[in-house]
Every structure is written in C-alpha cells, then in structure tokens.
C-alpha cells in the first residue's frame, strides 16, 4: 500500500511534465498517441506465493482490468523454475488518464473486491509476496502500441531487456537508433517484439525497456544472430552519433503464466 501511494504521489508531481512531452487523449484511444505501460515486478520467496500472485491476476485483477477496457495484460515468470522467481505483469493503457483512474475503479468494483479479498488482505504471517515495484513506461514513436504474437506462432520465450544509459542525451540517442533501423530489422528477422518503451518513472533511469519473443530458446538465438548479421544493424553500430549510448544491459528470459493474455 505504501509503495502504491508513493508511486501515485510521484506520478501526480510528474504528470504535467509528462503531458507536455507526450500529450494524451482524455477519452478515447488515439492511434497517433503512444501507449503507456505499467511494468510491475513481484518479489517472492516460495512457489506458493508465485501461485497466489498468478491466481490473483487470473481470477480477480485481469477480469477487472478487462472490464475497464484494459487488455491484453501479460503475466510472466522467469523461465527457469525456482522458489524465488519474480512475477512480471505488463499492463497497457491508452492514456495517463486511464492509468490514473485504475485505483478508484478497482476500489468501486465489487466483483474485484470480493475475488481479490484473500490476496489484498493477506496477513503478516502469510503474505502473498515479499514486495512489489512498478515502473511507468511510454511506448516509442516507432512502435506506439503493444503487439501480440501471431496466433499460429505462440512464443514460449519472452526476453525482457533494459538498456541503461549514462545520460539523458545518450538515452535519447539509443531510442533514435531503435527508431532509425533496429525495430524494423528485429521484426524482419523474426524477433517478434511485444513492446518498446522509455522509462518515465522507475529504476535505472535513464533507460529503455523492451520485450521480444520466440518459439523456443534455440529459435530465439537464431533470430538474434540474424539481427547481428543484418547490414542495417552493422551500419548503425558503426555510426559515430550512436557511440557509447548504452552503458549496461539487464537481460531476463521469461515464460507466460496461466494468467497471461499475451
């Protein structure tokens, strides 16, 4: 609860600046406007907690979000099973207004409150998770909306990458690099990107976050090799304007849970 209140307070302070740089529609989704994403990370200490988090999203939260028109919601866990695996939840919103209205709508949704009661009111002696954190992301202009994999090619591997830059200008340079060639090449070689985003509020700033997908790990590695061999990528790498625009990369391989709509 404290984390959620803190996040809302930061958003309230930053909202005017965000709206100036990324104006958003008040009512309907606009294809010309980038989506916003909440990326939530739950820290767990047992497989029981992982199951409780998954059940909460599957049976309570996702139905409530869908009733608000927010979908698809992605729920993922680390690809190698372990008791301390984190759970990652990706929530797409068409505007900051929609994102900001979520807490009040959940509070007023009696079906949600009833279905989520055991999770929301978990006692100190039997908590549903260790902690969770949230990042607010905004989609790149080069891919403004979340993209679902083709129905006939459901991926079993999702790769979540965070690229951390040493300064704001270096971070913007890396985004430009994506939009000037990396995104089209990734699509062409079969990396099946789900989303690309810049972190507005969250850890490791300035940074960008994106997700690609693949049928399996072997196929995913082959797709990356195709990207690395692409002439456009090699030309971008050699361009001095993009030199040293990433200082650190965080790479996590995920799989969907039974709750996931992605």
Regions found by a protein language model. Name each.
Residues 8-22:
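Bacterial N-terminal signal peptides
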């Amino acid at each position: 609860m404290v984390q959620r209140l803190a996040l809302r307070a930061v958003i309230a302070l930053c909202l005017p600046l965000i709206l100036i740089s990324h104006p958003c529609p008040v009512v309907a989704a606009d294809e010309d406007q980038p989506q916003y994403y909440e990326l939530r990370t739950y820290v767990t200490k047992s497989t029981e907690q992982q199951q409780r988090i998954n059940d909460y999203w599957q049976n309570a939260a996702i139905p409530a979000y869908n009733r608000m028109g927010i979908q698809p919601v992605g729920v993922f866990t680390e690809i190698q099973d372990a008791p301390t695996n984190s759970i990652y939840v990706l929530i797409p919103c068409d505007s900051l207004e929609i994102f900001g209205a979520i807490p009040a709508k959940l509070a007023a949704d009696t079906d949600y409150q009833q279905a989520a009661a055991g999770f929301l009111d978990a006692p100190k002696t039997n908590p549903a998770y260790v902690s969770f954190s949230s990042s607010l992301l905004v989609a790149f202009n080069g891919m403004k909306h979340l993209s679902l994999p083709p129905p006939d090619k459901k991926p079993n591997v999702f790769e979540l990458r965070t690229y951390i830059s040493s300064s704001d200008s270096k971070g913007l340079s890396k985004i430009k690099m994506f939009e000037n060639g990396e995104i089209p090449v990734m699509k062409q070689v079969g990396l099946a990107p789900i989303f690309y985003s810049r972190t507005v509020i969250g850890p490791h700033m300035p940074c960008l976050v994106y997700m690609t997908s693949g049928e399996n790990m072997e196929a995913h590695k082959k797709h990356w090799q195709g990207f690395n061999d692409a002439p456009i990528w090699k030309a971008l790498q050699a361009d001095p304007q993009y030199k040293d625009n990433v200082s650190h990369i965080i790479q996590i391989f995920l799989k969907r849970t039974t709750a996931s709509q992605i």
